[in-house]
């Protein structure tokens, strides 16, 4: 069997390429996913939603590969001075102009408070840095998404401000009371201001308020299918606790007809929901029920307790029972030959003479990255992109 592991809660580290010091903090909202991170998860080269396709057409794919760099280096709390009206989602940077497109069909995430009245926001960060604050703003009632987002479209005060939070497993987890009286679709605007640097990060988060009074679930992220899978493939949802230990595993071998990109997430979700009371997959309704849908990206993974993360493993059947690709010692390229053709599963020979295989999406985008960081066996972050065979 050919084994792929798509880690949806832990994504590759992207290091700053323009600073002399070691690591430069980057990040974006993971739960609910920010606009840029959600489009990245759809696949930079072939996004699924019309809005993300339009963002790529307007600004190119690099903006999505750089999902954790929507920032201003000299903000120092003066956010309205460095991020102009109409450019909030792209932080005033030309690279991210596609995120500023004024349209009503940006994919949104349904959110609702838990039993204590809070919602847990999860921010994915690449390095621990001192935080001055995380501020959360919400659009005013009557906001028109078909007009460019301006500062005046936001409520004047943040509905939540976090000044002390610890980085755990690459994420900041923040419990916030949701704003009162909001219904339907809105944009949450998040600002992360560092205290050890004037740098700040910005994120537009498209949400819809479900109207649920008490939500018993914690959202971990979307279950996304990038492509159809062959019949006979096995997909496994793995749930890890706060210590990184396997808490649950749910496997399903796909039958013909249940292996399409819209069908296999539904089939896996139905099995998980039948077998587990801790984790459910689907779309949350106003009454706290999680129902699976036939979709490549709309199903969310929910747990009843905080502190978990998930991963989806995919095993593909090998025709004729042969070895996995690369098992015969052959390679597709001698690195860095054919660099722009590298994709998930590409096997290369590194400078050390060893064979490396490009990891599955979403890591596969880094296989084409700068050799200083992603040269197999040599780059500073090569293990984010490659598996040693």
Curated annotation (Swiss-Prot):
It comes from the Bacteria. This is Chitin-binding protein CbpD. Residues 1-25 form the signal peptide. Transmembrane segments: none annotated. It is found in: Secreted. One of its GO terms (cellular component) is extracellular space. Disruption phenotype: Decreases chitin-binding, has no visible effect on extracellular staphylolytic or protease activity. Decreased association with the hyphae form of C.albicans strain SC5314; P.aeruginosa does not adhere to yeast form C.albicans. Residues 26-208 form the Chitin-binding type-4 domain. Its main location: secreted. Binds chitin but does not hydrolyze it, has no detectable protease or staphylolytic activity. GO terms for biological process: protein secretion by the type II secretion system; protein transport by the Sec complex. The lineage of its organism: Bacteria, Pseudomonadati, Pseudomonadota, Gammaproteobacteria, Pseudomonadales. Can be detected in the extracellular supernatant as a 43 kDa protein and a 23 kDa protein, both proteins have the same N-terminus. Only the larger protein binds chitin, which may protect it from further processing and/or degradation by elastase (lasB). It is not clear whether the short form is functional or a degradation product. GO terms for molecular function: chitin binding. Keywords: Chitin-binding, Secreted, Signal. InterPro entries: Cellulose/chitin-bd_N, GbpA_2, GlcNAc_Chitin_IntDeg, Ig_E-set.
């Amino acid at each position: 069997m050919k084994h792929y592991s798509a880690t949806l809660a832990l994504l590759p580290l992207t290091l700053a390429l323009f600073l002399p010091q070691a690591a430069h903090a980057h990040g974006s909202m993971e739960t609910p996913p920010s606009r840029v991170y959600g489009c990245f998860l759809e696949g930079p080269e072939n996004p699924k939603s019309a809005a993300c396709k339009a963002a790529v057409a307007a600004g190119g794919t690099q903006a999505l590969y750089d999902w954790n760099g929507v920032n201003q280096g000299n903000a120092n709390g003066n956010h309205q001075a460095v991020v102009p009206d109409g450019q909030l989602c792209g932080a005033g940077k030309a690279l991210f102009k596609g995120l500023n497109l004024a349209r009503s069909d940006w994919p949104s995430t349904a959110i609702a408070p838990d039993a204590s009245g809070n919602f847990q926001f999860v921010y994915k960060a690449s390095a621990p840095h001192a935080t001055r604050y995380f501020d959360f703003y919400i659009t005013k009632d009557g906001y028109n998404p078909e007009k460019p987002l301006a500062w005046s479209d936001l409520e004047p005060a943040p509905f939540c401000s976090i000044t002390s939070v610890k980085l755990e497993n690459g994420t900041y987890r923040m419990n916030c009371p949701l704003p009162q009286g909001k219904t339907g679709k809105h944009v949450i605007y998040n600002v992360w201001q560092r205290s050890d640097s004037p740098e700040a990060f910005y994120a537009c988060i498209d949400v819809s308020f479900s109207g649920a009074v008490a939500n018993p679930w914690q959202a971990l992220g979307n279950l996304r299918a990038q492509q159809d899978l062959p019949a006979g493939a096995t997909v496994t949802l793995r749930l890890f606790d706060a210590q990184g230990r396997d808490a649950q595993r749910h496997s399903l071998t796909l039958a013909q007809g249940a292996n399409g990109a819209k069908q296999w997430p539904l089939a896996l979700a139905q099995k998980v929901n039948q077998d587990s009371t801790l984790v459910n997959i689907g779309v949350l309704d106003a009454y706290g029920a999680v129902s699976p849908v036939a979709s490549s990206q709309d199903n969310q993974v929910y747990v009843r307790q905080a502190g978990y993360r998930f991963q989806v493993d995919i095993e593909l059947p090998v025709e004729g029972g042969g070895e996995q690709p690369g098992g015969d010692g052959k390679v597709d390229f001698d690195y860095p030959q054919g660099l722009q053709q590298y994709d998930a599963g590409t096997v290369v020979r590194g400078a050390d003479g060893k064979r490396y295989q490009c990891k599955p999406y979403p890591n596969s985008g880094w296989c084409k990255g700068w050799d200083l960081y992603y040269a197999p066996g040599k780059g500073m972050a090569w293990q984010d992109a490659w598996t040693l065979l």
